[in-house]
């Protein structure tokens, strides 16, 4: 991004930002790679920024191509064509649409790219190839994926040959997420908002029955699920003036000490279950010791994205055994789960005020957590 943090992108081929220079970014990625760590970029390709509705910038991706976008690259249903503040730009967005634009909600704060236009497709493919092969990123977190058709995610991933991608398709209905994944030809993972709004909310409310069969995990699609407790959007939802109150424990309250068991119990859930768990950094920063022990237990047991789960739930409890490559994890959530009783043959990973995570492992060497 030319300025700021990169959400309202103007020059995709300029990775200087408020966080540092492009040179510093490349150096950082190289250090992460030296530590055997993959690096994922937050990709904003739904919409374009600018100081005016008509402002566009050339995009220079070196060997991958140069591009000169203009208003004809913006979807014709974009608000630029109807907004009275658009001035001379009004009516100039003529980009083709194919039913992908505005699938769920128009992004009103910026102009939306017409991904049905071949020139836009070529620019985005060049951008991702450049980000991977020149800047050094390994994968993508696609922002606001509901703004364009899933087939373009498949197109862009196939072109860039990235190691990993996850889409932010913000929808609490598992069937809608599944439908989007099908549109992507199953060539990505998705943030599992359906598990966030069922199991994670159930843990916060003390309704542990919602943990059983929740979201993509319960639908047998854990391989495609990136599970999470909170994100920058849910955590800052009401603080940022948004109308959601999705933060675990209530808006602005998850980091309060009285919500510790809610936060850690929910993290124990995602770190025990199949799928690809994503720990929210503020949770990690505050509870590093506890969450670190859970991560090590998962690694020791060899729990993976397609691990099998045997579970039961009822009034005040959720009990699950998750089978890994090297052992298993036993998760006991809720006051009636018997969490204080160590299962035979298991070791304690971490115990809170109303939950515990235990594990077994056949590994000779104990996994080491390096952050």
Question: For the regions a protein language model found, what residue spans apply to each?
Answer:
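Active-site-proximal helices and loops of the catalytic beta/alpha 8
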Residues: 2-7, 13, 29-37, 41, ...
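Short, flexible loop segments at the rims of nucleotide/cofactor-binding pockets, characterized by
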Residues: 15-18, 117-119, 255-257
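Alpha-helical scaffold elements lining the catalytic groove of polysaccharide deacetylases
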Residues: 112-127
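Short secondary-structure boundary/capping elements
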Residues: 20, 119-123, 262
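Acidic/aromatic-lined carbohydrate-recognition and catalytic surfaces
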Residues: 1-107, 113, 146-167, 172
